From Swiss-Prot:
The protein, known as: Chaperone protein DnaK
Similarity-based family: Belongs to the heat shock protein 70 family.
Listed GO MF terms: ATP binding; ATP-dependent protein folding chaperone; unfolded protein binding
Keywords associated with the record: ATP-binding, Chaperone, Nucleotide-binding, Phosphoprotein, Stress response
Acidic residues: compositionally biased ranges: 627-641
Region annotation (Disordered) ranges: 577-641
InterPro entries attached to this UniProt entry: ATPase_NBD, Chaperone_DnaK, Heat_shock_70_CS, HSP70_C_sf, HSP70_peptide-bd_sf, Hsp_70_fam
Basic and acidic residues bias locations: 577-590
Reported induction: By stress conditions e.g. heat shock.
Native organism: Thioalkalivibrio sulfidiphilus (strain HL-EbGR7)
NCBIfam families in the cross-refs: PRK00290.1 (NF001413), PRK05183.1 (NF003520), prok_dnaK (TIGR02350)
Annotated positions of the Phosphothreonine modification: 199
Gene: dnaK
Length: 641
């Protein structure tokens, strides 16, 4: 059986890890980095770039570079968070036929899980390159406060990427696993404060020794799925735009290219201000007007940044209070505080956490990698590599159904340990009612309409009877991924109706299958593209080496031989302009045969001159053999030019 990998699918960055023996190993990507930007770009010539390559070209291609798509996953277009996002991002967000928020790129409509799947494919390939074997199974993390639709959409993204998602686990829980696995055995209560690129979570977790097992039990969780580092960046960007407007009288907000450059610089400035007291945002030629080009040069102090984001930091404290209250604990009961997510590197955030919990947060957990490490540990538990670890997670929000008068009746309260089941008997509201609509809701509000609608279904053919007489049993069943199944049964007839809750919109099975096929086709396309580039590079090397040999040997090459070589050269150059790999390889072989004797002569000439083996002959010989490895590197540069 292949390895199950652990993936932290983040808003800003993603990370992949795998168990090696009793330790989780974070895997470096092809660029040598341990985290990968969660960015996907679609270039003019149809190429899809993921990660650092996509981030590098964002400035020149803002409308077709998708970032922070996790904030859209599993969301309806009408949701206030989506409406807010539309104003902040340069790419187009539109309302899909099913009411979800989708994106449109180069006239192609795409669902957020499709975009996230591209990032997951990159993480999958990173793991496969390292392990040297195919990977088909993964544990993927989500913010603890993700609702059912968002979890289902994340599972869909995994499926589209060619991964069987063995488990969806909550990010703070994963971080606690990473922190607690190698700690001394014994009972402790930890608070995980997770402020990432797009989401905020806080979980109160008890780590205990139970019958020889290391048990991680989530006592309570809370959060905000639309609060993170991206919002901190936006506060700084807004400030810089205003300052520039005051100085130059130009509003940069209507210029996507300028805004993309500004986004990049604001993020860098924010990071720099975590370790220095002030920094310069220096952007020459940011824009131009009739009087000529304009440059931005604005000093930003740490104090200024802190004042801009103070309200955002304050917003993280309320969920901490609620989580503690729900866990039935006070601040003094917490033994350790763990910081997760890149935004927790900001000193002001650390101070706020320290002031609230009354203790220094732990510094021995890598905020960028802890979640992926925890996911890999959970993957190890599922794969049987990690023994004696038990993870007890909770459902973040209450679940129930709409009852008479538009009220939400809760069947499962928030912070209930999962997996779990709950059953309740309801009846009809009218005489001779023969059907009951079960409207499933998630949230904490009393009014049904104020909660998230997860879906609805009908139980029909109830025998006519006075109101209140029929007995309809509704059962909720939440699995270990936090995903809900609901069934309703008429106790008189035994007739039952059940559904796996998909978002009231969500992707249908057919849509997911279509996206899986698209992704597979894209993988084949990528492979063909790499093979074509490798063939081109090998041909290019041979052309260069042959021309060098011809020049070096001069008149020593007979006219007939020279003509044959030049003809083969010309044919190969022509083939290289096209996209036919087989044609390029055939012409390369023809040139190699025609120019084969040149290498020997150059070698003999150099030996006679005392320079054995160096120069064009050696170069040509190697070009005729194998240049595929070099081609990998050249291909990347080639596409970025």
């Amino acid at each position: 059986m292949g390895k199950i990998i652990g993936i932290d699918l983040g808003t800003t960055n993603s990370c992949v890890a795998v168990m090696e023996g009793d330790k989780a190993k974070v895997i470096e990507n092809a660029e040598g980095a341990r985290t990968t930007p969660s960015i996907v770009a679609f270039t003019e010539d149809g190429e899809v770039l993921v990660g650092q390559a996509a981030k590098r070209q964002a400035v020149t291609n803002p409308k077709n570079t998708l970032f922070a798509v996790k904030r859209l996953i599993g969301r309806r277009f009408e949701e206030p968070e989506v409406q807010k996002d539309i104003k902040l991002v340069p790419y187009e967000i539109f309302k899909a036929d099913n009411g979800d928020a989708w994106v449109r790129v180069r006239d192609k409509k795409m669902a957020p899980p499709e975009i996230s799947a591209r990032v997951l494919q990159k993480m999958k390939k990173t793991a496969e390159d390292y392990l040297g074997e195919p990977v088909t199974e993964a544990v993927i993390t989500v913010p603890a406060y993700f609702n059912d639709s968002q979890r289902q959409a994340t599972k869909d993204a995994g499926k589209i990427a060619g991964l069987e998602v063995k488990r969806i686990i909550n990010e703070p829980t994963a971080a606690a696993l990473a922190y607690g696995l190698d700690k001394k055995r014994g009972d402790s209560k930890v608070a995980v404060y997770d402020l990432g690129g797009g989401t905020f979570d806080v979980s109160i977790i008890e780590i205990a020794e139970v019958d020889g097992e290391h048990q991680f039990e989530v006592l309570a969780t809370n959060g905000d799925t639309f609060l993170g580092g991206e919002d901190f960046d936006m506060r700084l960007i807004d400030y810089l735009v205003e300052e520039f407007k005051k100085e130059q009288g130009i509003d940069l907000k209507g210029d996507p290219l300028a805004m993309q450059r500004l986004k990049e610089s604001a993020e860098k400035a924010k990071i720099e201000l975590s370790s220095s007291q002030q920094t310069d945002v220096n952007l020459p030629y940011i824009t131009a007007d009739a009087s000529g080009p304009k440059h931005m040069n604005i000093k930003v102090t740490r104090a200024k940044l802190e004042s801009l984001v103070e309200e955002l930091i304050k917003r993280t404290i309320e969920p901490c209070k609620v989580a503690l209250k729900d866990a039935g604990l006070s601040v003094s009961d917490i033994d350790d505080v763990i910081l997760v997510g890149g935004q927790t590197r900001m000193p002001k955030v650390q101070d706020a956490v320290k002031n609230f919990f009354g203790k220094e947060p732990r510094k021995d957990v890598n905020p960028d990698e802890a979640v992926a490490v925890g996911a890999a540990i959970q993957a190890g538990v599922l794969g049987g590599e990690v023994k004696d670890v038990l993870l007890l997670d909770v459902t973040p929000l209450s679940l129930g159904i709409e009852t008479l008068g538009g009220v939400m009746t809760k069947l499962i309260e928030k912070n209930t340990t999962i997996p779990t089941k709950a059953t309740q008997v309801f009846s009809t509201a009218d005489d001779n009612q023969t059907a009951v609509t079960v409207h499933v809701l998630q949230g904490e509000r009393e009014m049904a309409s104020a909660n998230k609608s997860l879906g609805r279904f009908d139980l029909t053919d109830i025998p006519p009877a006075p109101r209140g007489v029929p007995q309809v049993e509704v059962m909720f069943d939440i699995d270990a991924n936090g995903i809900l199944n609901v069934s309703a049964k008429d106790k008189a007839t035994g007739k039952q109706q059940s559904i796996v809750i998909k978002a009231s919109s969500g992707l249908s099975d057919e849509e997911v299958e279509r996206m899986v096929r698209d992704a597979e086709a894209h993988a084949d396309e990528d492979k063909r593209f790499h093979e074509l580039v490798a063939a081109r590079n090998q041909a290019d090397n041979l052309v260069h080496a042959t021309e060098k040999s011809l020049k070096e040997l001069g008149d020593q090459v007979e006219a007939g031989e020279k003509q044959a070589i030049e003809s083969a050269l010309s044919e190969l150059r022509e083939a290289m302009k096209g996209d036919n790999k087989d044609e390029i390889e055939t012409r390369t072989q023809k040139l190699a045969e025609a120019s084969g004797k040149l290498a020997e002569r150059v070698y003999a000439k150099q030996s006679a001159e005392g320079g054995a083996g160096e120069g064009a002959g050696a170069e040509q010989a190697s070009a005729q053999q194998d240049d595929v490895v070099d081609a990998e590197f050249e291909e990347v540069d080639d596409k970025k030019k």
